[in-house]
Amino acid sequence: HDQLIGMKGYGEGALKMKGALSNLDIDGEVYLDSAYLVSVPYGISMRFANDPVRITDSKLLFENFMMYANNESPLNIQGSLDFTNIEKMMLDIRMRAQNFLLIDAKENARSEAFGKAYVNFYGAMRGPVSNLKMQGKLDVLGNTDMTYVLKESELTTDTQLDELVKFTNFKSGKPVVVERPALEGLNMMLGMSIDESAHILCALNADQTNYIDLMGGGDLTMTYNSVDGIGITGKYTLNNGKMKYSLPVIPLKTFDIQDGSYIEFNGDPFNPTLNITATENVRTTVNEGQGTGRSVDFICGVKLSQTLNKPGIQFIVSSPNDATLQDELNTMSIEERGKIAITMLASGMYL
């Protein structure tokens, strides 16, 4: 499966050729039937419309040519492939698609990403086939629902509680590594807008019991070249969502992600910077001595910072409606507040 891109299917038609073999002039028409553009390493299969394609003066003409991925909304292509010089074939096409189902992947044991991704796309690709330049705009639509599994994620705290917070995958068996050849000769720049209704679930372990369920949006820029590979920059702001999180001493909790949390991409698409605060409300009795106590509402949770590969986790607690207790919490160090937060999350008590 070294081949990056190939074609399968049937085509029939008539061609007229004249001139020297080194400089053929070709005219004619080809009818495609059940023809596909496929990339085995990347799991892509796109069906060509069963339409005639004209060849004029050694130019393959795309005239409102349609390609289909996973639904009946086509990618529309206009332009030409000029093979007057076989050694230097030139492509010049414009592409557009609306509500295009770009990804439709079911979960399996090797899945890193699965679900459905719907997009609008406008773009152009130009240049010699060996050195193409692509620019465009990709809008990820609100009906998108994707899951991304971080199988190797190991989250640790930046307080003194390191040993409490480790995720380990105990499943045996060596993972299967899929070798994907690099895309040679392509320079790409895509503006990406993610609709605020798009739903992306980021699983923090292989069995998906710990996860961050993201609702949000943002504007990102995605670049690709064969030297640097793929890069993403921009900010994905969270306006909603849940985080499910368990620790050796804390039962599985569901926290609410606070508005204004965000994920910022600085190049590496697999290692963004995190700024996520996720909390839950806890009501508990605070002992005032002599066996008396009063009921207090606390906001308790976790704050994720630093990068996805090496995140910092801080446990947080506050009592916004009780000034006396809040003053008491303010005098403590981050570590002391963290221990109070962990105790509260584990036992429901303020100690």
Question: Which positions does each model-derived feature cover?
Answer:
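Strand-loop-strand
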Residues: 5-14, 28, 32-351
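Acidic, carboxylate-rich catalytic segments that either coordinate divalent cations
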Residues: 24
